[in-house]
Amino acid sequence: MNVSRPVNGIERLLKSLNCDGKLGIALLAACAVLLLPVLAGDAGREALRYDRTALAAGQEWRLLTAHFVHLDFDHAALNSLGLVLMWALFARDYRPRQWLAILLGSIAAIDAGLWLRDSTIAWYVGSSGALHGIMAAGTLAHLRRRDLDGWILAVFIVVKLAYEQSAGALPFTDNHSGVVVDAHLFGTLGGAGIAAFLAPRMESL
């Protein structure tokens, strides 16, 4: 005889936030990737950041590592919270390999955009651009399912990017001076561009 164990309230909550089982473990690991580099201090950040001069000298690893280091703990924590929000909204919309492609596509678009279009930017750190790519890809999945929140998210993204391109960083993000708003635009384009060629899950949760 098969007996199913009743699902309690906490388990239902974790599942609704895409934090149950292996997804929850993966989220903790992803947050650790963003938070732990802070322990390396200024030296670690300077060794891993996007640095135009260092890249020209052949230090290509910075094209990847720059997106996982931050100015300080507050900056890393803010981006970790953004990751948790993106995870809760979108984690089940694509398979893990698809999410990896979206992440790498977003990072590549940011790197290319900064190198080719923003030559005045000497250095860059942070995950916010990549998170914008993740948000764009998840929003596209919801639009394909004709979910109402997909349209709401799409309007939010367009309005946010338009504001940033015309007026600069949002007021509540100015605590970290020098926010590179173009990274948000490039990340969005990269994430949406990759997601356009992927098949998301089509059933709503």
Regions found by a protein language model. Name each.
Residues 1-61, 86, 93-96, 104, ...:
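N-terminal signal-anchor transmembrane helix
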Residues 26-41, 83-137, 152-164:
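Small-polar-interrupted transmembrane alpha-helices in polytopic inner-membrane proteins
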Residues 45-72, 164-171:
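Extracytosolic (periplasmic/ER-lumenal) interhelical loops and adjacent juxtamembrane/interface segments
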Residues 46-50, 65-83, 91-102:
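Alpha-helical transmembrane segments and their cytosolic membrane-interface
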Residues 72, 115-124, 169-178:
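Membrane-interface helix caps and helix-loop-helix hairpins in membrane proteins
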Residues 76-83, 125-136, 178-199:
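Alpha-helical transmembrane segments that form the membrane-embedded catalytic/substrate-binding core
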Residues 139-146:
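Membrane-interface transmembrane helices that cradle and orient dolichyl/undecaprenyl
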Residues 153-203:
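Terminal transmembrane helical module of multi-pass membrane proteins
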